[in-house]
Amino acid sequence: MLFDALLVLSFGGPEGPDQVMPFLENVTRGRGIPRERLASVAEHYLHFGGVSPINGINRALIAEIEAELGDRGETLPVYFGNRNWDPYVEDAVTAMRDDGVRRAAVFATSAWGGYSSCTQYNEDIARGRAAAGDGAPQLVKLRHYFDHPLLVEMFAESISVAAQSLPADVRDEARLVFTAHSIPVAADDRHGPNLYSRQVAYATRLVAAAAGYSEFDQVWQSRSGPPRIPWLEPDIGDHVTALAERGTKAVIICPIGFVADHIEVVWDLDSEVREQAADLGIAMARARTPNADRRYARLALDLVDELRGDRDPLRVAGVDPAPGCGYSVDGTTCADSPRCVARITG
């Protein structure tokens, strides 16, 4: 077996009111964000008792991965580490070292390229290995999976379920809107270039086709920072207003940029955008994210199997496909899969 462990690597989130501000300070360290701005964002978490859904979802996902491994008759210890909150990646890698793990696959809970979606996870891996010191396991970050058949299937199915929740008299006229986390235009230009935005656009087309939609919109959400800095647009709030002005009576929002119910989903969409839509007379349904779906667990293990040499990469073919990085080793920059495979098996 190529790997003797799997590390689920994620963003992290607070699990109590007293953890919210320290968590936000971790997230924004070195960026000079005013404390009053952090206090404003903290209110979003405090609305939910100071608990982000993300850690609980990831623990449930790990349970599904372990169950799937059991169904396959495989034994592979699964570890959990975060960038910004307990359990930290440094502690997870140190635990793997202490347990005698020599090489682990790393499944990041982000399907995309770009800095915060990919490169920063490589930095997390390097930081975790440095903390573990001598004897740290080799860590192989698995590839981008924005075009994996199971991801496309889960989102397409969730759109159909969301559509059925709309009132029958407006269901057939509902506008499908895909949304992902906005980033500064300059940041998108630097990576790829435009790797993140191209991948989101391509995945949007794949999911829309799988769900049976020929017309749809793709927008961005949750921007922050000074207004003078351009971010990817259009913003979902502006777009919902524009839809209302065009007479749209119902909207299905698919948060394709999120593999789980981050606070940006349960607050920005389920609270703020839903309230805005209601004020504008628009019925809104939100498609669910993969969260801890068993198919998401299978997706993670599919990526592991690709590096074991058991199968070719699973990808949905479409028009004008977006590129995706392969695998990276020990926090290095992503490279094409064949070169990475040679590096870890040679």
From Swiss-Prot:
Protein EC: 4.99.1.9
Keywords: Cytoplasm, Heme biosynthesis, Iron, Lyase, Metal-binding, Porphyrin biosynthesis
MF term (GO), any: ferrochelatase activity
Keyword Secreted set for record: no
Pfam family, one: Ferrochelatase
CDD domains: Ferrochelatase_C, Ferrochelatase_N
An example Gene Ontology biological process: heme biosynthetic process
GO cellular component: a single term: cytoplasm
Residues given in the record as Fe-coproporphyrin III binding sites: S52, Y121
Enzyme superclass (EC): lyase
Membrane-traversing stretches: none
PROSITE patterns the record matches: FERROCHELATASE
InterPro entries per UniProt: Ferrochelatase (IPR001015), Ferrochelatase_AS (IPR019772), Ferrochelatase_C (IPR033644), Ferrochelatase_N (IPR033659)
Subcellular location: Cytoplasm
The keyword Protease is assigned to this record: no
Binding site for Fe(2+): H181, E264
Catalytic activity entry: Fe-coproporphyrin III + 2 H(+) = coproporphyrin III + Fe(2+)
Protein's pathway: Porphyrin-containing compound metabolism; protoheme biosynthesis
Job of this protein: Involved in coproporphyrin-dependent heme b biosynthesis. Catalyzes the insertion of ferrous iron into coproporphyrin III to form Fe-coproporphyrin III.
Family: Belongs to the ferrochelatase family.
Protein's name in the database: Coproporphyrin III ferrochelatase
Organism field: Mycobacterium sp. (strain KMS)
Gene this protein is translated from: cpfC
